[in-house]
């Protein structure tokens, strides 16, 4: 997790319950946005020293991704160099059990097969794709997301919307992923503004919408927005959702001109009143 979630009492909602049933726990709260190789190493050391049986990831995409990397390396120590996990990871053993508790409605890291780490020396991000890293349990509870400031709700919400749009328009899309992405766009487009304004029902809808988008794009991948957003995050430390928000309109216009399904996409979304 990160220091902010500890200081504002979000982590205590979990650890207090663990105390009630007599579970022993330790904590690593050094995660920062765009987690680095160094952060993964620090978290791994804390986990190994604790002797714990499983990991709990509390936070947005950065704590989730950090926890995934720690879990994978713990059971596959031959990949202690995180860089060796880039791309399609050749691990043989499942991750240490991970319980994911997202506190933002955006990344869907709790259901995807990938995680993103920043190489602080080379100032680049790299994506690790590994079916072994999916958390065993995900607690998607809108109550854990209530404390997000409006700016974070907006940024993470656009990340979720970008997942849905890119998953829908990617060349690998097919009938099942189209169904997931269209539904995700419908949910997110109808809830994002009200969620930022603080409406409870909209917050619950965003929690669902980002999850559905994650189930979709985890099967087909993403596109140019994320391809360009990752370098922005690595080089300028731009928050991921903000980078997506900057790039998404431009990539959508590019895709509309150069991809064969743009009219089909637009017609479908207009019929569902997702766009005007």
Regions found by a protein language model. Give the residues of each.
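Short, well-ordered alpha-helices that flank and scaffold nucleotide-derived cofactor binding pockets
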Residues: 16, 45, 72, 76, ...
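Carboxylate- and glycine-rich phosphate/diphosphate-binding segment that chelates Mg2+/Mn2+
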Residues: 114-220
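Glycine/threonine-rich beta-strand-loop-alpha-helix active-site module
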Residues: 38-140
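Gly/Pro-rich interdomain helix-loop hinge
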Residues: 235-263, 267, 276
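ATP/NTP phosphate-donor binding region
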Residues: 1-54
């Amino acid at each position: 997790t990160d220091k902010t979630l500890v200081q504002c009492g979000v982590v205590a909602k979990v650890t207090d319950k663990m105390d009630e049933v007599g579970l022993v726990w330790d904590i690593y709260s050094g995660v920062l946005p765009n987690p680095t190789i160094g952060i993964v190493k620090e978290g791994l050391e804390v986990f190994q020293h604790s002797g714990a049986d499983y990991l709990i990831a509390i936070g947005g995409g950065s704590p989730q991704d950090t926890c995934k990397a720690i879990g994978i390396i713990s059971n596959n120590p031959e990949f202690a160099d995180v860089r060796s996990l880039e791309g399609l990871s050749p691990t043989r053993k499942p991750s240490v059990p991970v319980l994911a508790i997202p506190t933002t409605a955006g990344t869907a890291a709790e259901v995807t097969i990938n995680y993103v780490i920043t190489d602080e020396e080379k100032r680049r991000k790299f994506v690790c794709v590994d079916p072994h890293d999916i958390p065993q349990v995900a607690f998607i509870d809108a109550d854990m997301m209530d404390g997000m400031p409006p700016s974070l709700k907006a940024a993470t919400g656009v990340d979720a919307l970008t997942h849905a749009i890119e998953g829908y328009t990617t060349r690998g899309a097919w009938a099942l992923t189209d169904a997931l992405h269209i539904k995700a766009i419908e949910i997110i487009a109808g809830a994002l503004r009200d969620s930022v304004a603080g409406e409870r029902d909209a917050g619950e809808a965003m929690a669902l919408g980002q999850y559905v988008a994650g189930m979709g794009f985890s099967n087909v991948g993403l596109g140019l927005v994320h391809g360009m957003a990752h370098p922005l995050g690595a080089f300028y430390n731009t928050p991921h959702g903000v980078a997506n928000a900057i790039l998404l309109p431009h990539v959508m216009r590019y895709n509309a001109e150069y991809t064969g399904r743009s009219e089909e996409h637009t017609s479908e979304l207009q019929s569902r009143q997702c766009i005007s």
